[in-house]
Swiss-Prot record:
Function: Binds directly to 23S ribosomal RNA and is necessary for the in vitro assembly process of the 50S ribosomal subunit. It is not involved in the protein synthesizing functions of that subunit.
Gene Ontology MF term list: rRNA binding; structural constituent of ribosome
Gene Ontology CC terms: ribonucleoprotein complex; ribosome
Protein family: Belongs to the bacterial ribosomal protein bL20 family.
Lineage start: Bacteria, Pseudomonadati, Pseudomonadota, Gammaproteobacteria, Alteromonadales
Keyword vocabulary terms for this entry: Ribonucleoprotein, Ribosomal protein, RNA-binding, rRNA-binding
PANTHER family assigned to the protein according to its UniProt record, in alphabetical order: 39S RIBOSOMAL PROTEIN L20
One Gene Ontology biological process: translation
Native source organism of the sequence: Shewanella baltica (strain OS155 / ATCC BAA-1091)
Name recorded for this polypeptide: Large ribosomal subunit protein bL20
Record SUPFAM superfamilies: Ribosomal protein L20 (SSF74731)
Annotated InterPro entries: Ribosomal_bL20, RIBOSOMAL_L20_CS, Ribosomal_protein_bL20_C
Pfam families reported in the protein's UniProt record: Ribosomal_L20
Length: 118
């Protein structure tokens, strides 16, 4: 069998990794060995944070809903309970959006929740 020289493959692999590491600080963007580690770690962070992003946004929405509900004299948990009893099914993302951008509509939702609780 003929000898296989792997220069083309190695060069392509190095180029691919260094392209992914473009913009990194210092040797991380220039040295292949360090760039491989940096790109691998970046991938791990990206994988983890794609999952954390969902949790963090839900936390943000709940904090916004809670703040708006308390301005209207109701705690978050009682507000959500009131909405469920009034059979109003709006998810937290939309509720947070309404709380921030349309305070009048949110106030009416709070009133409906209060009525359902009584």
């Amino acid at each position: 069998m003929p000898r296989v020289k792997r220069g083309v493959t190695a060069r392509a692999r190095h180029k691919k990794v260094l392209k992914l590491a473009k913009g990194y600080y210092g040797a991380r963007s220039r040295t292949y060995r360090v760039a491989v580690q940096a790109v691998t770690k970046a991938g791990q962070y990206a994988y983890r944070d794609r999952r954390q992003k969902k949790r963090q946004f839900r936390q943000l929405w709940i904090a916004r809903i809670n703040a708006a509900a308390r301005q209207n004299g109701l705690s978050y948990s009682r507000f959500i309970n009131g909405l469920k009893k009034a059979s109003i099914e709006i998810d937290r993302k939309i509720l947070a959006d309404i709380a921030v951008f349309d305070k009048v509509v949110f106030a009416t939702l709070v009133e409906k929740a209060k009525e359902a609780l009584n």
